[in-house]
Amino acid sequence: MNLNKLFTALRQRKNVPAHNQQAGRRERYTHALEQFLDGHQPAVRLGGVYTLANLADEWLTDASLPEQVRREEAQTIIDSLTGCIRTPYPLAQKRQILESDEAPEEYEGDFARDQEALREEQLVRRTVFKEFSRRLAAVAENNKVDKAESQHAVPPISPTWADLRFDFSGAPIFYPLRQLHFQNADFASTTFYGPADFSGATFHGETSFSAAQFTADASFNSANFNDWVGFSAAHFAGTAEFSRSRFADAASFATVTFTGEADFSDAVFSAAADFAVSAFKSDADFSRLNTEGIASFAAVTFEGKAVFTASTFHDEAHFAASVFNRPAVFSKSLFGGAARFAGIVTKQSAMFRNVRFASAADFSGASFTQYEDFGGARFDGDATFSRASFIALPRTRYEMDFPQHANFGNATFAQDADFSQATFTAHVGFYKATFARAVSFNGASFEGAYFADATFGHGADFRQTSFMYVKPSFVRLWIGGCRGHGSRHRRIRRITCLRRARRARTVSGAARRNFLIERSFSLSARCCTTRIPGTKSSRSTPASVSLRSKT
């Protein structure tokens, strides 16, 4: 007998049990799928779910097959189960009604029967997620370094489960999914009827909720996203709760609409957090937010109160062109990277009290209304407020309790500060503010200004600056940075524009009358030779102040 034919016959005989086993799995798969789809009793349908999940385990652990074949067979089963999850269910839209204790008036249909049918469908569909979760949790547990010392007993599941895809896109979800594990989950364009509960859930692999519709409250409290997650273009009709959630990779909430209150308090973003062009229709709570990567809130609209109290931005923070229609609160926050607030609009109070800007802070072109508080703020990098406007709108009887002024009292500017072309139609206070380096108010316009006890450690540029209606106060002003005069800081006592203008030789009577309405002056600590109007000597004068009427 030919040896080649003998070896071929032996191989075929050896593979007969394997082929029979694979054929048996396919027969069980067909039967289980029929049970799941066509069974009229919940117990029968649940039996089909368990059988299908176990068959996926068998395929993945069959060492006689190539890994690709094992994965393809298991993926076929997963696709069948997720396909059933995506199947429309008419009673899903009535979830909140059917979960009530009593039938509402004029309810169409048999309320009791519909209640029972909804509960059964919720049980079966949620069981599919629970079977997935049980295996994915086991994979995560087995991947731990000290899995031998784990307190949780888990079955030996193939890590190939972590490579499978779970497509729930467009599905109707009408049951809670809290404290479950998900892997490579696609919830794009999914509609969540009633409360969407993912609290305590863990997401592995890339996760998508893009364009998802949350018709009621949504809870992701204490959820963990271990890889990229996207909520772009999603809509939250109720409250959106992400308190204490953790994002290990980049997270996108771009163009999301939050109709109800949004709670991201104590959330941690270890990579980029993108909320650009989102809309918050109600209050947004980001207090104690922690972002390790770039945080983008550019062009965001806040219709309600925006709270970022005690938040930490380790990298760049972008709020450029955002609109705050209600109070914006950033008090006690830390900006480790560049803070970009260029072009923002605040319609009510803006609170930046005791904020630390460790890098550059850009508020150029910003528009502030009502009340701005930068008291105790610290600017370690360049601070730019060029072309910013501080506007006091006419008060109404509903706004009488809102003070209308800008406060930079006790603020510290460690690097250059630029307020050029800024407009303050509300009173602004720089009481005890410290400018360690050059500061420019060139071309700025003040309704009223208070610089008492302010310290200018370097050049201070007030050229073309105008003070309208209310004379500025420079009581106990300190100006430094003038070389060749001994001490670094020299004190100028009681510089009052109106008094000096009346004694200055260059100011005519007509100009003085005009000066009472609108005055401008130039203050520079870089020149030490020009006499201050009203003084007798220029030798000990550390800076020059020239007062002139604005024509």
Q: How does the language model describe each region?
A:
Residues M1-T551:
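Intrinsic low-complexity/IDR segments
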